[in-house]
């Protein structure tokens, strides 16, 4: 099996899906918990217009802060997201061919689709789904997106989310993310993942778990909530969705700090879901 560098894995996936016909988009410039939160998925999966895109999305999950000490769990990581709308009949075959392009021999390695229906409570999104395991390790999530913002997706979109770090761990045969070959160079030009990201991982973990100001975050949540509602009334669903993302991230930070109770957590989830719903509803009204 070819031992592609981390950036070669990304480039290979971009080239593969570009050749299929996907537009290669850029990461969204906001804090998101997963590639699904990019408006290219949340908003564009709604409505009837065909939409085929692929993109890398840096993602943040404050609750996964481990000061860079966990072998494969981090508060900041990368996903490669593919959206095919409508979902083609051969989407599973397309996915498997993408693995072959990464040097994974399907005749040798055990690839399994393990049923795992997907749901995002804050987005009001759900779909039939499968985890994809390679020799017992999850490397991707495969979902037929059926609902976003509480609105049915017609037609259903196919979503493929590659966990780039886990995929790279398997392809390169290493045990810790920090040891991943980032750029495929040797000597002075060689870079490991840890050299690129792990100082930030430690610093943001300390911030997320110890130093974030909960009172400030509560104010930010309420401010973003109010601003989202105001922008929807002004028929501006895209900047409104940005405010929804800000509220969602503030909630995730509060959750990581452990300052909200179980009951409060459920209330915050419903508030973020409401924001996502009104953004999706307004966007669909304006883009039928």
UniProtKB/Swiss-Prot annotation:
One of its GO terms (molecular function) is ATP binding. Keywords: Aminoacyl-tRNA synthetase, ATP-binding, Cytoplasm, Ligase, Nucleotide-binding, Protein biosynthesis. Gene3D superfamilies: Bira Bifunctional Protein, Domain 2, Class II aaRS and biotin synthetases, domain 2. It is an enzyme of class 6 (ligase). SUPFAM superfamilies: Class II aaRS and biotin synthetases. It is found in: Cytoplasm. One of its GO terms (cellular component) is cytosol. Pfam families: tRNA-synt_2e (PF02091). It catalyses: tRNA(Gly) + glycine + ATP = glycyl-tRNA(Gly) + AMP + diphosphate. One of its GO terms (biological process) is glycyl-tRNA aminoacylation. Belongs to the class-II aminoacyl-tRNA synthetase family. Tetramer of two alpha and two beta subunits. HAMAP family: Gly_tRNA_synth_alpha (MF_00254). This is Glycine--tRNA ligase alpha subunit. It comes from Rickettsia rickettsii (strain Sheila Smith).
